[in-house]
Amino acid sequence: MSNQIKLLVGLANPGLEYKRTRHNAGAWVVEELARVHNVSMREESKFFGLTGRIQSNGDDLRLLIPTTFMNLSGKGIAAMAKFYQIKPEEILVAHDELDLPPGVAKFKKGGGHGGHNGLRDTISKLANTKEFYRLRIGIGHPGHKDKVAGFVLGKAPTKEQELIDAAVDESTRCLDILLKDGLSKAQNRLHTFKAE
């Protein structure tokens, strides 16, 4: 799968009040990758978000953090994919994942939205295809589905945040492996990682 990913998206809600909430974990991956590669993200209205570009092995990796609310994330993703002629299977969407504990992150191809409104809208705007890749950043689960909305829009306690940040850092390193050596090598490394 070497160099197949052409667009990396970090799902988030816009605005300072949401910046450090669990729901924005996907955006933290893109921000960290941009920082490591010394890339400035800039607002681009035609893509409804912050964009950047990294070159790896002569190939472009486009970066996008939608600045629409989470449930409208697909709008910018679809616009960017259409403009740069990027297929769904060349897209990797980083997002917060309730079903993984803090300190864990996993790659996945395809699948449903699992109740995640950002994924739901992405699937919808990509003509109902689910064949894009995901980078699932574990945030843990509040224990009851009625508590999920408040949980994802809340900030993690310090210890949990440190675990999430460690998983984001490792995910960023694994994205470099993915771009150079393909998914299986990146997966092998990331899927054995667990922050303590």
UniProtKB/Swiss-Prot annotation:
A GO cellular component annotation in the UniProt record: cytoplasm
Annotated site location: Discriminates between blocked and unblocked aminoacyl-tRNA: 13
Binding site for tRNA: 18, 69, 71, 117
Reactions catalysed according to its record: an N-acyl-L-alpha-aminoacyl-tRNA + H2O = an N-acyl-L-amino acid + a tRNA + H(+)
Active-site residues, record numbering mapped to chain: 23 (proton acceptor)
Keyword RNA-binding recorded: yes
Localization terms from the record: Cytoplasm
GO molecular function: peptidyl-tRNA hydrolase activity; tRNA binding
PROSITE patterns: PEPT_TRNA_HYDROL_1, PEPT_TRNA_HYDROL_2
Major location (coarse): cytoplasm
Entry-linked Pfam families: Pept_tRNA_hydro
EC class of the enzyme, as a word: hydrolase
Listed EC numbers: 3.1.1.29
Record's keyword terms, sorted: Cytoplasm, Hydrolase, RNA-binding, tRNA-binding
Site positions (Stabilizes the basic form of H active site to accept a proton): 96
Entry function: Hydrolyzes ribosome-free peptidyl-tRNAs (with 1 or more amino acids incorporated), which drop off the ribosome during protein synthesis, or as a result of ribosome stalling. Catalyzes the release of premature peptidyl moieties from peptidyl-tRNA molecules trapped in stalled 50S ribosomal subunits, and thus maintains levels of free tRNAs and 50S ribosomes.
Family: Belongs to the PTH family.
Subunit structure: Monomer.
Protein name stated in the entry: Peptidyl-tRNA hydrolase
Organism from which the protein derives: Aliivibrio fischeri (strain MJ11) (Vibrio fischeri)
Gene that encodes the chain: pth
